[in-house]
Amino acid sequence: MGEMGKAMGLLISGTLVYYHCAYRNATLLSLFSDVFIVLLCSLAILGLLFRQLNVSVPVDPLEWQISQDTASNIVARLANTVGAAEGVLRVAATGHDKRLFVKVVICLYFLSALGRLISGVTVAYAGLCLFCLSMLCQTSQSLGNCVLKRGNGQILEQEAHSDT
């Protein structure tokens, strides 16, 4: 799936989560429960249908496992992110870097004020929208550069043929 497909899928999923949590005033736990109930019922109906049609579906549990390297990579990335955030906060708290301290304090005050004005779900959804927008812009820029290169190549080829 391309970057644009990932961004659109993420945006659609985020919109559904935002609707469920913000407008229905439901919790995230309620959303996960609803999703698992729908998946369980759908799988049960498909199982009954396949049994009725005498279709055998092989279930290989090894296909659903991730490798140990993948699991280690996920944990290492999470640990690096938490470690980097902890390092920034430690340097800011000691006061060795005054500019970093001021930036952290301003960001924390801004987030505190934002949290009092609007709900956390709205902030998370706005962040998701901005993230998807940046993914779409990066994809469109790379497509634009590709088109420009092709266009310039065709123009250069036409000029070369017209000179001869």
Curated annotation (Swiss-Prot):
Recorded GO CC terms: endoplasmic reticulum membrane
InterPro entries according to UniProt: Reticulon, RTNLB22/23
Stretches of the chain forming a coiled coil according to its record: none
The entry's keywords: Endoplasmic reticulum, Membrane, Transmembrane, Transmembrane helix
Chief place where the protein resides: endoplasmic reticulum
Cysteine disulfide links: none
Pfam families: Reticulon
Domain Reticulon residue range list: 1-164
Domain of life: Eukaryota
Compartmental location: Endoplasmic reticulum membrane
TM spans (from-to): 30-50, 117-137
Membrane topology reported for the UniProt record: Multi-pass membrane protein
Protein name (database record): Reticulon-like protein B22
Species whose genome carries this gene: Arabidopsis thaliana
